[in-house]
Amino acid sequence: MLWAISVHLDKYLVERFFKDSDVAIMVLFTALIVVLALPIIWYFEPTVLNPSLGSIALIALAGILYMTGMLFYLRALQSEEASVVAPFFQTGPLFGYVLAYFVLGETLSPRQMLGGALIIVGALFVSLRFGRNMKTFKTRLAALMVTCSLIMAVSSLIFKVFALRVEFWTTTFWMFVGEGIFGTVLLMIPSYRRQFLTLLRTNTAALLSINASNELVNLGGGLGNRYALLLAPLSLVQAIGSTTTLFVFAFGVVLSVFFPWFGRETLSGWELLQKGVAAVLVATGVALVTR
């Protein structure tokens, strides 16, 4: 649910502040928030320096991969509605199944495989254009989001492996370091640095308050998801997380009806049917996977 809220906040920020700017600037704000969290984690968990350099490098790589996935996701969100982008996160569990099978030894039952197939069908169905552009597949959207899901699955796998071997907050600390490194590299690019500083000067109060709230919501969802990885198989956690699509769709309808200035989704009869069918397919798939 927190991630669904964050998706709509991301869309609002993209529409209001980043329509003509590179969405990579939004990733800089994410990096800023996690860097500010580092000393707090270090204070409460002094053992963060205990892992070997090799372990630290791999955990930091998970953070870099996470930010790379976020960049693909934001580029997709810049040109599509939130409820159209979100279903593609459902491809994540399938990547998670494969990775967990080969790396962690997790196996899939026939029911889980059927559920995974329904999730994919739902994600693909919502990406089809109808009407004037009937049956035109949104290739760019699919490429961005499938790549995003694969990268996120690899990042989650690395996090789980080390969180089980080391410690949750220590692993989180070094993953945040990797996210901070990614943001630092972006900030070193002159064009991104200029856009970042310009946005801060022209929209300081609104941008910082909304973005900070969004990043805290996203951080809460991310930490909850990562902690769940310690309690359940990777594929199961990702499948349950795929319910984000249903919440995104529901919140999108509420916003369009009651708060259209904040976010607007297409509410034509066919669009509602298409998104509704996709949501049902995804929900059925999740139910089969988690049963």
What are these regions (language model features)?
Residues 34-52, 102, 124-134, 180-206, ...:
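Membrane-interface helix-cap regions at the ends of transmembrane helices
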Residues 1-4, 50-66, 104-121, 146, ...:
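Structural signature of hydrophobic alpha-helical transmembrane segments
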